[in-house]
């Protein structure tokens, strides 16, 4: 217990005092910055054409986390990505973005989370120069799961139809075999009918002509006187 009071408690007190001092200093820096917002807005409007390409270039070169924070700044995100935010603020200082220098210095001293107000203000002004973000429609997971069974049922239907087609083809094939057999069986009958219709040529006996005897008619005698 004596060690706790003599060693640990004093450290906590110093830490709390340090944090409270940091918060107080950060609050003072935020207040000073808020007073200069009107001037910053005027400078941004005057340099709008000049800043446009530079802002887009610095934005494209930064990380995905910072890009998300620029478009939608949140205190939790600023604290979590404090180092990346600080780096981006320094890039804005290089292109002389109005108000970025004061915010970069405050963020470097106290952390982006402690001066979230000024950082958010600068990010909102930066986002004005950025092209509109194309948002893709996100399909809920439940809808995707609901669609999956429907998709799997379709092949089953095609399989069923293909199976039916196969059965029909098989039946037709089976049905064709008797017809072919009948045709084959009928062929001999047709041939028989043809044979009956066309009888074999009968042998014609040519009668032997007997030698003709030439009988001379009797000569009429002249009448007697």
From Swiss-Prot:
Residues 140-225 are annotated as: Disordered. Its cofactor is Cu(2+). GO terms for molecular function: calcium ion binding; calmodulin binding; copper ion binding; microtubule binding; phosphatidylinositol-3,4,5-trisphosphate binding; phosphatidylinositol-3,4-bisphosphate binding; phosphatidylinositol-3,5-bisphosphate binding; phosphatidylinositol-4,5-bisphosphate binding. The modification Phosphoserine is found at residue 107. Residues 140-197 have a biased composition (Basic and acidic residues). Signal peptide: none annotated. Belongs to the DREPP family. GO terms for biological process: cellular response to copper ion; cellular response to iron ion; cellular response to magnesium ion; cellular response to magnesium starvation; cellular response to mannitol stimulus; cellular response to molecule of bacterial origin; cellular response to potassium ion; cellular response to salt stress. GO terms for cellular component: cytoplasmic microtubule; cytosol; host cell; plant-type vacuole; plasma membrane; plasmodesma. A lipid is attached at residue 2 (N-myristoyl glycine). The modification Phosphothreonine is found at residues 32, 152, 177. Keywords: Calcium, Calmodulin-binding, Cell junction, Cell membrane, Copper, Cytoplasm, Cytoskeleton, Host-virus interaction, Lipid-binding, Lipoprotein, Membrane, Microtubule, Myristate, Phosphoprotein. It comes from Arabidopsis thaliana (Mouse-ear cress). Coiled coil: none annotated. Disruption phenotype: Long etiolated hypocotyls. Reduced accumulation and cell-to-cell movement of Turnip mosaic virus (TuMV) leading to an enhanced plant resistance. Interacts with Turnip mosaic virus (TuMV) P3N-PIPO. This is Plasma membrane-associated cation-binding protein 1. Binds 6 Cu(2+) ions per subunit. Decreased of the heat stability in the presence of metal ions (e.g. K(+), Ca(2+), Cu(2+), Sr(2+) and Mg(2+)). It is found in: Cell membrane; Cytoplasm; Cytoplasm, Cytoskeleton; Cell junction, Plasmodesma. Its main location: membrane. May be involved in intracellular signaling through interaction with PtdInsPs and calmodulin (CaM); may keep PtdInsPs attached to the plasma membrane until Ca(2+)-CaM reaches a competitive concentration subsequent to an increase triggered by a stimulus, thus leading to PtdInsPs release and subsequent activation of InsPs-dependent signaling cascade. Interacts competitively at the N-terminus with calcium ions and CaM (in a calcium-dependent manner), and with the phosphatidylinositol phosphates PtdIns(3,4,5)P(3), PtdIns(3,4)P(2), PtdIns(4,5)P(2) and PtdIns(3,5)P(2). The gene is PCAP1.
